[in-house]
């Protein structure tokens, strides 16, 4: 269903407001570069500091600009089950192909609570849902056993796993079985190639905002069985992967895009822009990747 390089799109701002023209241009750039799908308003899209109206508008705009050329997996998570259902329902109404739903954060539910949260979403809206497990941000880990229970629900089609634990790919597969055709996507750029080798289908990527052609080429090389080329591309990208988190994300990605003249570097508080040392690290990583600024 979903595979390859999938950018977790930044949401550009200009003078405090969403820069719709810049966002539309970024979507066009991603499609031209060979990205396999698009994820608007996820963590990298600063969903936590968007108003509900802004969130929904960005999803609608992404679907409108993509115009069916690639799938749109709309960010739609919340620590309120009712709000998550509302966002998933909007994603469906807007024409998104799926919703990316993060585990509830801050309120720290147990595994039964996580299961019931996602089951409520599954039951409320007939739209494919990709689970999003990122315990470094949500505090709670969506355990493989819970993922396996959820995979048996009709609308739960996959997971974005940002734990960096590649054992999860095999463990999920062993628990779920092949008959479910459950899609596993990495949420950790530095380990994405290893994730693919373990049986993953793709990566929802921060780095792909900045280097979409290289990220797409790495995935295509792997899919073609050309591991030497895939590894060579990954070596070009590894410093950029690390630089994308040298300051709170998505500040580094936005700074890099601003250096390329593609959008402004503005982030919303409580995030702040990268400092001079971080900027130097990003510049160096871009140069090593062969990106023009």
UniProtKB/Swiss-Prot annotation:
Gene3D superfamilies: Aldolase class I. Keywords: Amino-acid biosynthesis, Cytoplasm, Diaminopimelate biosynthesis, Lyase, Lysine biosynthesis, Schiff base. The record marks 43, 106 as: Part of a proton relay during catalysis. Pyruvate binds at residues 44, 204. It is found in: Cytoplasm. Its EC number is 4.3.3.7. PROSITE patterns: DHDPS_2. It comes from the Bacteria. Pathway: Amino-acid biosynthesis; L-lysine biosynthesis via DAP pathway; (S)-tetrahydrodipicolinate from L-aspartate: step 3/4. GO terms for molecular function: 4-hydroxy-tetrahydrodipicolinate synthase activity. One of its GO terms (cellular component) is cytosol. It catalyses: L-aspartate 4-semialdehyde + pyruvate = (2S,4S)-4-hydroxy-2,3,4,5-tetrahydrodipicolinate + H2O + H(+). Belongs to the DapA family. Homotetramer; dimer of dimers. Catalyzes the condensation of (S)-aspartate-beta-semialdehyde [(S)-ASA] and pyruvate to 4-hydroxy-tetrahydrodipicolinate (HTPA). This is 4-hydroxy-tetrahydrodipicolinate synthase. It comes from Hyphomonas neptunium (strain ATCC 15444). The gene is dapA.
């Amino acid at each position: 269903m979903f595979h390859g390089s999938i950018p977790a799109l930044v949401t550009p701002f200009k003078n405090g407001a969403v820069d719709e023209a810049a966002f539309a241009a970024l979507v066009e750039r991603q499609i031209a570069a060979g990205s396999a799908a698009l994820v608007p308003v996820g963590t990298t899209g600063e969903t936590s500091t968007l108003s509900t109206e802004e969130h929904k508008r960005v999803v609608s705009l992404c679907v409108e600009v993509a115009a069916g050329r690639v799938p749109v997996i709309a960010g739609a998570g919340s620590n309120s089950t009712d709000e998550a259902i509302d966002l998933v329902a909007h994603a469906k109404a807007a024409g998104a192909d799926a919703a990316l739903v993060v585990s509830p954060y801050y309120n720290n539910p147990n595994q039964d609570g996580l299961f019931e949260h996602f089951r409520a979403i599954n039951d409320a809206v007939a739209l494919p849902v990709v689970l999003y497990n990122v315990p470094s941000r949500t505090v709670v880990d969506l355990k493989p056993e819970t993922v396996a229970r959820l995979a048996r629900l009709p609308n739960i089609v996959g997971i974005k796993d940002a734990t960096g634990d590649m054992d999860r790919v095999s463990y999920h597969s062993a628990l779920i079985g092949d008959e479910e055709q459950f899609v596993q996507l990495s949420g950790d750029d530095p380990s994405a190639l290893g994730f693919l080798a373990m049986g993953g289908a793709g990566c929802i990527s921060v780095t792909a905002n900045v280097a979409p052609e290289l990220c797409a080429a790495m995935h295509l090389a792997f899919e073609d069985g050309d591991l030497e080329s895939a590894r060579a591309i990954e070596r070009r990208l590894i410093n950029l992967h690390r630089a994308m988190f040298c300051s709170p994300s998505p500040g580094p990605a936005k700074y890099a895009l601003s250096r390329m003249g593609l959008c402004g570097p503005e982030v919303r508080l409580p995030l702040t822009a990268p400092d001079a040392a971080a900027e130097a690290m990003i510049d160096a990583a871009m140069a090593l990747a062969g990106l023009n600024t």
